[in-house]
A protein has these predicted regions:
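Aromatic "clamp/platform" in nucleotide-sugar-dependent glycosyltransferases that forms part
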Residues: 111
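Short alpha-helical donor nucleotide-sugar binding micro-motif in glycosyltransferases
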Residues: 90-91, 98-103
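Conserved donor-binding/catalytic core segment of Leloir-type glycosyltransferases
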Residues: 22-48, 61, 173
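Short hydrophobic beta-strand element within catalytic cores of glycosyltransferases
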Residues: 128-131
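Carbohydrate-associated surface elements
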Residues: 9
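Conserved acidic donor-binding segment of nucleotide-sugar-dependent glycosyltransferases
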Residues: 144-153, 161-166
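Nucleotide-activated donor-binding/catalytic signature segment of Leloir-type glycosyltransferases, i.e.
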Residues: 73-91
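A short, well-ordered alpha-helix in the C-terminal region of glycosyltransferases
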Residues: 161, 168-177
Length: 177
């Protein structure tokens, strides 16, 4: 047994309690990362459209920048969900933690992701996470929902379950921290 796998990690936040969610009626589902083909942003937009066909009390945030940003803005508009979709642009440092703490669900639908630390950051501040089975972190995160990146129905169902079933939200939030 000469080989040991050492996975990526995030530094623990010294004062995680400082990041609190603002009480609100609408739920917030966040994609945070580069808006590029590898990250699967179009799957996030399509999953959002399907969730919004079932319920209207959810808002979707795409935080980040990249070569597909304009395409995603147009896709959200073409899908008829622009009024429920927000694009923040690039976030860094404290802004990342604040955005994730405001999220009821974090989603990483990556097509190709060697590891991906953003779900770890999300779970650290209590945001339940839905991640792509194709990401490296899928092998170590036991308290995240895992879907194939192309399975938009599974993603939409997972989002809907977390935002509509408080027990599921609570369990994923508490077990993820």
């Amino acid at each position: 047994n000469k080989v040991t796998t050492v996975h990526n990690a995030v530094d623990p936040l010294p004062n995680v309690e400082q990041f609190k969610k603002t009480p609100r009626k609408d739920k917030v589902v966040t994609f945070l990362g580069r808006i590029t083909m590898q990250k699967g942003p179009e799957y996030f937009v399509e999953a959002a459209r399907r969730v919004l066909q079932k319920t209207k009390d959810v808002r979707f945030v795409m935080a980040g920048s990249g070569d597909m940003m304009n395409q995603m803005i147009h896709l959200a508009a073409k899908s008829g969900i622009a009024d429920k979709f927000h694009f923040t642009g690039f976030l860094k440092g404290r802004q990342v933690h604040e955005m994730l703490a405001e999220s009821d669900v974090y989603m990483m639908p990556s097509v190709s992701e060697p590891f991906g630390i953003s779900p770890l950051e999300a779970m650290q501040v209590g945001a339940p996470s839905i991640i792509s089975k194709q990401s490296g972190c899928a092998e170590i995160l036991t308290n995240a929902i895992k879907t194939d990146y192309w399975d938009i129905d599974a993603m939409a169902d997972a989002i809907y379950a977390i935002v509509k079933y408080p027990a599921m939200y609570k369990m994923l939030r508490e077990q993820g921290i």
